[in-house]
Amino acid sequence: MKASMFLALAGLVLLFVVGYASESEEKEFPRELLSKIFAVDDFKGEERGCKGFGDSCTPGKNECCPNYACSSKHKWCKVYSGK
């Protein structure tokens, strides 16, 4: 009886996954999402004259974007807390 309940539940889960996948293909959601992500990355790379979070920097120079500061310990831009 436990095995039949497990198989029935597994079948319902499989049906749900297949239905969701076919609906997502119709909307082309994954491709659209990826294209938007890469478009945002390209935009940031062209427009930014300063370094953002996690970018390598030289302590003492003002290379990081506003609200970021160059960490002298790690030598990358991090969020500036004002302390």
UniProtKB/Swiss-Prot annotation:
Q: What is its main location?
A: secreted
> Which cysteine-cysteine pairs are annotated as disulfide bonds in the entry?
50-65, 57-70, 64-77
User: Which Pfam families does the entry link to?
Assistant: Toxin_12
Please give the residues making up the propeptide in this record. Answer: 22-48
Extract the signal peptide range.
1-21
What cellular-component terms does GO give this entry? extracellular region; host cell presynaptic membrane
The record's subcellular location field reads:
Secreted
Q: In which tissues is it expressed?
A: Expressed by the venom gland.
InterPro entries linked: Huwentoxin-1, Huwentoxin_CS1
Q: Which family does it belong to?
A: Belongs to the neurotoxin 10 (Hwtx-1) family. 15 (Hntx-3) subfamily.
Record-given protein name? Mu-theraphotoxin-Hhn2h
**Organism source for this protein?**
Cyriopagopus hainanus
